[in-house]
A protein has these predicted regions:
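Phosphate/nucleotide-binding beta-alpha loop and adjacent structural elements of enzyme active sites
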Residues: 1-215
Length: 215
């Protein structure tokens, strides 16, 4: 509850109100909006996975700087190798959280479902995902990996980054911790766009939901 109140208060202080978009209202995609306002953006890709968003941003912008964060060491190694000749792409083997420290990453059969949160048992989501990979729900988590964590406030201070044009977050229910760790940047209006990918299904223990902000 404290996290929910903090986030609502934080966005109110900045003059924003969070609510659902009416289904009848046409909305532009991020990819349509970004080029209208940004030319040489600094982008943070939190939850880089296999580099899907990196490739997407490469198609939108000619000149850019991307700092991507991927706690899964195996995926990090692949990203590091894939973009080793791109001087404007910085790959970090870190989990973004509310503070510097350590945590445990639950690595699942489907890499995109891996999370810093525990997976809820006996849910429809888990049964469906397990079936897709021909495994038992109890074995959907392949292994647990100890990871280093960082807050974006600290990362920006360490790397002398004054502004972030796009903050993309896809952390499987861990988004609130990322936002709390970005609070100074947000309060100083140093982040222009925040792109959140939020899971709405019951999947993780204490996962962040858009509905939390509406309550």
């Amino acid at each position: 509850m404290r996290i929910k109140k903090f986030l609502k208060k934080l966005f109110r202080l900045l003059g924003y109100k969070i609510e659902k978009i009416h289904p009848d209202i046409h909305e532009l995609t991020f990819d349509e909006i970004y080029p209208k306002f940004l030319k040489n953006p600094v982008i943070f890709d939190v939850g880089a996975n296999e580099g899907q968003s990196i490739e997407r941003f490469k198609k939108i912008f000619v000149n850019f700087e991307i700092h991507c964060f991927e706690p899964n060491y195996s995926l990090y190694q692949k990203l590091k190798k894939k973009y080793e000749n791109n001087k404007n792409i910085f790959v970090n083997n870190l989990a973004v959280s509310k503070e510097i420290g350590e945590g445990v990453l639950n690595i699942t059969q489907k890499s995109g479902s891996s999370s810093m949160l525990d997976i809820k048992k006996n849910t429809k989501w888990l049964k469906v995902r397990s079936k897709q990979f021909n495994t038992d729900p109890d074995n959907f988590i392949k292994k647990k990996e100890k990871v280093s964590t960082v807050s974006l406030n600290d990362y920006c201070k360490t790397h002398d980054i004054k502004e972030v044009d796009i903050l993309k977050i896809d952390t499987q229910g861990f988004e609130d911790k990322v936002l709390i760790g970005s609070s100074e940047m947000i309060k100083n209006q140093s982040i222009k766009f925040i792109e959140l990918e939020i899971i709405q299904k019951e999947a993780y223990e204490n996962n962040f939901s858009f509905y939390d902000l509406e309550k």
